[in-house]
C-alpha cells in the first residue's frame, strides 16, 4: 500500500508540474481568442460642432441669425448661410457578435449613428451606417475573404428596402486590437474612405488602474465621393439607393453661391455658355473631402479599446490641390472660425460611461488571463512539488517492522 501511494504521489506531482509549466507557456497563449458573445456600446460627449444643414440648404432658409447677413439675402444665398457654427452633435456605436461565428472566427456588426441633440428622433439623425466584419478569433485580424460590408444607405426610404451592400476584403483593425498588442504601428481601417492606413503607437499611460497604449492616426484630405463611389460600384452599376448616398458628396452651385471670386474658380462646369451665365457666375462643381485625426487607447493584454477620440472635418473643395490648401493650419483655423465650405466639423471624444464600460470588459479579460497564466500554475506547481516530495519521502523512508 505504501509503495502504491508513493507511486501515485510521484506521478500526480510530476503531472501537476508539467501542467504548471505548460499552462502559461502553451495553453494560455493558445487560449487567447476573441469571445463569441461580444457586446459593446460607446458614445461620445455632446460637443459643439459645425454642420451644413442640408434641409435649410434645400429650402433656401439661412440658419440661426445668418438671415441678416448681406450674403444671405436674395436668390443666390451663399453656402455659408446654411452652416451652423455651434450646433451640438453626438455619436453612438453599438457592436454585437453575429452569425457566422464559430471556433475559428467571429463576425461583428457595428451600427453607428451621428445625431443632433437639439432635435428629437427621427429628425435628429444626420447619418447611420451598419458595418460587418469577420475576424480571426486567434489573431483578431479580419479574415482574407471578401465578406466585409459597409451599409452607407440611409435606413429610410423605398430605395433602402432589400438593399445589400457590396462585399469586400478588409485588411485593417477597427473594433479590436490583437491580444498582447505591441508598442508598434498597426494597419487601421477607416470607414469613411474605406482605406487602410497605419495607426502609430504614441504613448503608454494608465486608465482605471491598468496600463494602456495609445495610438494615433491622421489622414490627409480625401475625396469621399471618389472613395465611396469606388466601393459602391465594386459589384456592378450603382443602384438608386447608392446614387442617393453619393448625391451629397458632390454639389454644383454658381460661383457666387460658393462665395468664389473669378480668380478662385478652378473648374467651371463643362458646357457652360458664358453668354448665358447669370450674375451669380458659372456653375462650379465641388466634392466633399474628409480629414481626421484619431486617437485610440487600448488595454494591451486583451486588445480591448478603452478610449477613443476623432477630430473629423468634412469640407467641399474643387479639387485635391485646393483641399490640401484649405487644410493647411492657418486656412483651417480661418475656415472653422467662419465656415464657408464646411460640411461637418466634429471633435468627438468618448464619454466617461463608455470608457468605464470598456475598461470593465478589459479587466474581466485580464482576470481570466491572470488566473490561467499565474494563479493556477502557482497552485498546481506547489501542489506538484508537495506530492513529489511525499512520494519520494515514502520511497526513501524505511518501513518499520
Region locations from a protein language model:
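Short N-terminal edge-element motif at the start of the domain
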Residues: 161-193
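Juxtamembrane interface at the cytosolic side of transmembrane helices
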Residues: 2-11, 365-401
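Membrane-proximal low-complexity regions enriched in glycine and acidic/polar residues
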Residues: 184-315
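Solvent-exposed N-terminal domain segments of exported/luminal and surface proteins
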Residues: 2-157
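N-terminal short leaders/motifs
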Residues: 144-163, 222, 236-244
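Helix N-terminus capping/helix-initiation residues
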Residues: 35, 53, 136, 178, ...
Amino acid at each position: 500500500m505504501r509503495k502504491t501511494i508513493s507511486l501515485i504521489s510521484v506521478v500526480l506531482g510530476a503531472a501537476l508540474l508539467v501542467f504548471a509549466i505548460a499552462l502559461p507557456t502553451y495553453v494560455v497563449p493558445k487560449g487567447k481568442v476573441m469571445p463569441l458573445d461580444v457586446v459593446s456600446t460607446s458614445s461620445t460627449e455632446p460637443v459643439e460642432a459645425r454642420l451644413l444643414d442640408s434641409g435649410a440648404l434645400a429650402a433656401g432658409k439661412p440658419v440661426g441669425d445668418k438671415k441678416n447677413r448681406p450674403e444671405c439675402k436674395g436668390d443666390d444665398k451663399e453656402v455659408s448661410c446654411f452652416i451652423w457654427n455651434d450646433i451640438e452633435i453626438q455619436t453612438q456605436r453599438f457592436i454585437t457578435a453575429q452569425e457566422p461565428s464559430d471556433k475559428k472566427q467571429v463576425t461583428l456588426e457595428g451600427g453607428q449613428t451621428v445625431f443632433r441633440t437639439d432635435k428629437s428622433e427621427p429628425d435628429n439623425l444626420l447619418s447611420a451606417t451598419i458595418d460587418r466584419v469577420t475576424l480571426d478569433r486567434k489573431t483578431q485580424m479580419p479574415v482574407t475573404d471578401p465578406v466585409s460590408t459597409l451599409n452607407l444607405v440611409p435606413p429610410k426610404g423605398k430605395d433602402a428596402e432589400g438593399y445589400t451592400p457590396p462585399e469586400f476584403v478588409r485588411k485593417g483593425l477597427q473594433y479590436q486590437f490583437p491580444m498582447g498588442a505591441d508598442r508598434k504601428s498597426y494597419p487601421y481601417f477607416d470607414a469613411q474612405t474605406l482605406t487602410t492606413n497605419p495607426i502609430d503607437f504614441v504613448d503608454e499611460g494608465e486608465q482605471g488602474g491598468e496600463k494602456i497604449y495609445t495610438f494615433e492616426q491622421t489622414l490627409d484630405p480625401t475625396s469621399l465621393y471618389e472613395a465611396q463611389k469606388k466601393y459602391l460600384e465594386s459589384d456592378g452599376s450603382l443602384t438608386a439607393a447608392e446614387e442617393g448616398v453619393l448625391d451629397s458628396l458632390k454639389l454644383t452651385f454658381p460661383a457666387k453661391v460658393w462665395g468664389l471670386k473669378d480668380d478662385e474658380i478652378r473648374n467651371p462646369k463643362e458646357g457652360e455658355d458664358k453668354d448665358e451665365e447669370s450674375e451669380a457666375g458659372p456653375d462650379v462643381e465641388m466634392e466633399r473631402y474628409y480629414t481626421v485625426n484619431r486617437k485610440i487607447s487600448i488595454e494591451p493584454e486583451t486588445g480591448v479599446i478603452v478610449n477613443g477620440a476623432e477630430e473629423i472635418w468634412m469640407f467641399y473643395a474643387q479639387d485635391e490641390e485646393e483641399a490640401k490648401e484649405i487644410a493647411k493650419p492657418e486656412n483651417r483655423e480661418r475656415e472653422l472660425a467662419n465656415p464657408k465650405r464646411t460640411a461637418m466639423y466634429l471633435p468627438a471624444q468618448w464619454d466617461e460611461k463608455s470608457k468605464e464600460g470598456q475598461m470593465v470588459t478589459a479587466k474581466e479579460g485580464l482576470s481570466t488571463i491572470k488566473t490561467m497564466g499565474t494563479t493556477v500554475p502557482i497552485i498546481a506547481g506547489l501542489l506538484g512539488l508537495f506530492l513529489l516530495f511525499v512520494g519520494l519521502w515514502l520511497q526513501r523512508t524505511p518501513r518499520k517492522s
